[in-house]
């Protein structure tokens, strides 16, 4: 199985790139091969098709409302759904003041999905909207926990890679990680 992680953002989105690069550095420090690219646009229209293990896109809402969101493909694998579910739950525990406002299941030809994952194949794909960037309350809460969010994403990605994309193995790893966290907190 492919153990390469693909991280992408929109080309001119500074905040998303900051998170993507911080996560990429954290994963590289842990020995994971990471590819970072910009989303599909006129400048990279002729890139070749690639296959990765995990593909994640990062973006922010810009409508002034409050909250974060998650977008998955309608035909995503069980490991992809479990991975996104665990990441969203852990992100929710870390940032309870940023509420989830959107969970979408889209087709592959959806405009946003196509922009981020055109010519990319992966066992696990997801688009995370980390918060609303032009909502001051959301943005401040996100910036306070920024290093912890990077570590959270890195931990979950490592867990998924070590399971070799086996759903049962991944669920066991998540369960044992939660038990370790509860023991440390007590």
Predicted regions and their residues:
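Extracytoplasmic/secreted envelope proteins and their assembly/folding machinery
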Residues: 16, 20, 24, 43, ...
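Active-site-adjacent mobile loop/cap segments within catalytic or ligand-binding domains
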Residues: 5-6, 55, 65, 105-185
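Active-site microenvironments of hydrolase-like enzyme catalytic domains
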Residues: 2-3, 7-10, 38-85, 108-134
